[in-house]
């Protein structure tokens, strides 16, 4: 066991790989995956450990020098046999995503630098998703979508998820919603690839075992023209989470726990690689929550080794060939952190920083004005299922306004169509109505980042809000004096019922 370096009884860290005892993992957890195509994926995947040693250098990297997952992905994308942290390399990009906030600027820079009549490097590798400032009367926000539409038509962009009827999102079959959830649902997230996006939470896609990170408009403009980007290879921190997940915890609790341990600067320009038995037990949506917030710790990217859960999700959404990679047994990590998840409690991040961690039960005297359930972090189908489960178990009505913003059209439909397990066939929407919540809103980023004054559920007053979103900086959801407590859907729902920050164990046993 590694030495304890924190006052927390749940965390151990070792500065060397040998201290961690890699050899203690059972041999049966090794895996063997060859190049994957739809319907031809190995079913022998049982864990997330390094591949067997008889693999060729072409798929495992250097035999003498081990590499991490991120290093292998970047080595392959740069056509090198070996890369090490600190290397500056030109990387071939598999997918570039942009949205209505940054898309016009990225295309503008592309035209300025490459010429008004220049063509993008590959119109089938660019994904354009309106999602931020959508359902608003703000003319400038609406103009951004118009500009993207013009560029996508001109460039024959295949994957432009357009919206034209702002009064009825369901009248727009191409419209999806929040980019990071839509990317996964539409099959753009694939193990072993490089995915870049003009949004800091692009790191969400690392849940699929790929290198995914956010970039600025200037870099995006260059990628539009060349399909390449200059990157510095990041060192990798490893987070090993073991133990049975308590029924009252969610991935949001795990990532808030981690950020609280290492701080918002603790992973600056580093990869955060997650593994362990707890990670293996998580669904894809929960893994997405985990990777979504690595940037709140300063991380360059987050990554989870792909396993059967990953491949089952991906193969049902794409026919594009992909090749998973895994960290070598002799790969170098700059730090190892180990958590016993079975001993963790529900947590929140108090204003005004994601690392201002506290136990939910320690904040029981904090009165709140509203609850917000939504965003790329906490607006997925399983997030709403969790909130509905708690509401149903409690059998009570909310004491504060509770706003629900599904991330995508698919999530919105799931809220109205899928029965909540153990609720007698009731859907989320039915349970939310019985609990007195607001009607689920049109899918978008909504009030997560404030937005125009008429944005649904925006904090226009200095109120206290419990939110399933990812940031709680001053002004993040609107009013500069607003106070945001970041929490899991369970904790958010419990807080809605009590009118204060609440521990979900009050309602979940």
Swiss-Prot record:
Catalytic activity: (2R,3S)-3-isopropylmalate = (2S)-2-isopropylmalate; a 2-(omega-methylsulfanyl)alkylmalate = a 2-(omega-methylsulfanyl)alkylmaleate + H2O; 2-(3-methylsulfanyl)propylmalate = 2-(2-methylsulfanyl)propylmaleate + H2O; a 3-(omega-methylsulfanyl)alkylmalate = a 2-(omega-methylsulfanyl)alkylmaleate + H2O
Region (Disordered): 1-25
Cofactor needs: [4Fe-4S] cluster
UniProt-annotated location(s): Plastid, Chloroplast stroma
Name of a matching Pfam family: Aconitase
Tissue expression pattern: Expressed in roots, leaves, stems and flowers. Expressed at low levels in siliques.
Pathway as given in its UniProt record: Amino-acid biosynthesis; L-leucine biosynthesis; L-leucine from 3-methyl-2-oxobutanoate: step 2/4
Biased composition (Low complexity): 1-24
The protein's Enzyme Commission number: 4.2.1.33, 4.2.1.170
Major location (coarse): plastid
Cofactor note: Binds 1 [4Fe-4S] cluster per subunit.
Binding-site positions, [4Fe-4S] cluster: 376, 445, 448
CDD domains linked to this entry: IPMI
Domain of life, source organism: Eukaryota
Any Gene Ontology biological process: glucosinolate biosynthetic process
Job description of the protein: Catalyzes the isomerization between 2-isopropylmalate and 3-isopropylmalate, via the formation of 2-isopropylmaleate. Functions in both the biosynthesis of leucine and in the methionine chain elongation pathway of aliphatic glucosinolate formation.
Record-linked PANTHER family: HOMOACONITASE, MITOCHONDRIAL, HOMOACONITASE, MITOCHONDRIAL-RELATED
The protein's name in its UniProt record: 3-isopropylmalate dehydratase large subunit, chloroplastic
Species annotation: Arabidopsis thaliana (Mouse-ear cress)
Gene responsible for this protein: IIL1
């Amino acid at each position: 066991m590694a030495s304890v370096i924190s006052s927390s009884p749940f965390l151990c860290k070792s500065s060397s790989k040998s201290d961690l005892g890699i050899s203690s993992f059972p041999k049966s957890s090794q895996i063997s995956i060859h190049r994957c195509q739809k319907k031809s994926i190995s079913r022998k995947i049982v864990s997330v450990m390094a591949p067997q040693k008889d693999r060729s250098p072409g798929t495992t990297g250097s035999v003498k020098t081990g590499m991490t997952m991120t290093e292998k992905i970047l080595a392959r994308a740069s056509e090198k046999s070996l890369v090490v942290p600190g290397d500056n390399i030109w990387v071939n990009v598999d997918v570039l995503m942009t949205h209505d906030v940054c898309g016009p600027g990225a295309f503008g820079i592309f035209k300025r630098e490459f010429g008004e009549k220049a063509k993008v490097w590959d119109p089938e590798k660019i994904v354009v998703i309106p999602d931020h400032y959508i359902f608003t009367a703000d003319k400038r926000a609406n103009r951004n979508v118009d500009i993207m539409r013009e560029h996508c038509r001109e460039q024959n962009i295949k994957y432009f998820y357009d919206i034209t009827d702002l009064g009825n999102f369901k009248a727009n079959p191409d419209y999806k919603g929040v980019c990071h959830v839509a990317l996964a649902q539409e099959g753009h997230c694939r193990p072993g690839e490089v995915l870049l996006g003009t949004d800091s939470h692009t790191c969400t896609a690392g849940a699929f075992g790929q290198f995914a990170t956010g970039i600025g408009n200037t870099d995006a403009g260059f990628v539009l023209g060349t399909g390449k980007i200059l990157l510095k290879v990041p060192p990798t921190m490893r987070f090993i989470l073991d133990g049975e997940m308590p029924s009252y915890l969610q991935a949001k609790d795990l990532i808030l726990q981690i950020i609280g341990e290492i701080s918002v600067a603790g992973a600056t320009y580093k990869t955060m690689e997650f593994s362990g038995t707890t990670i293996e037990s998580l669904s894809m949506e929960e893994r997405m929550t985990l990777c979504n917030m690595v940037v709140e710790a300063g991380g360059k990217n987050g990554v989870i080794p792909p396993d059967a859960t990953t491949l089952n999700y991906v193969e049902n959404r794409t026919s594009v060939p992909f090749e998973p990679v895994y960290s070598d047994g002799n790969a170098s990590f700059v730090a190892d952190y180990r958590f016993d998840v079975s001993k963790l409690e529900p947590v929140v991040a108090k204003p005004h920083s994601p690392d201002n961690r506290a136990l939910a039960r320690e904040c029981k005297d904090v009165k709140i004005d509203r609850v917000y359930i939504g965003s790329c972090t906490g607006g997925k189908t399983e997030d709403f299922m969790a909130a509905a489960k708690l509401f149903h178990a409690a059998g009570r009505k909310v004491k504060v306004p509770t706003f629900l913003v599904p991330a995508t059209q698919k999530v919105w439909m799931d809220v109205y169509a899928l029965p909540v397990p153990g609720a007698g066939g009731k859907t989320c929407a039915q349970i939310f109505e019985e609990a007195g919540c607001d009607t689920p809103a049109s899918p978008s980023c909504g009030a997560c980042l404030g937005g125009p004054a008429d944005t649904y559920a925006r904090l226009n007053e200095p109120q206290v809000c419990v939110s399933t979103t990812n940031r709680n900086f001053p002004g993040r959801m609107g009013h500069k004096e607003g106070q945001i407590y970041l929490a899991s859907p369970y904790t958010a729902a419990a807080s809605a019922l009590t009118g204060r920050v609440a521990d979900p164990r009050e309602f979940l046993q």
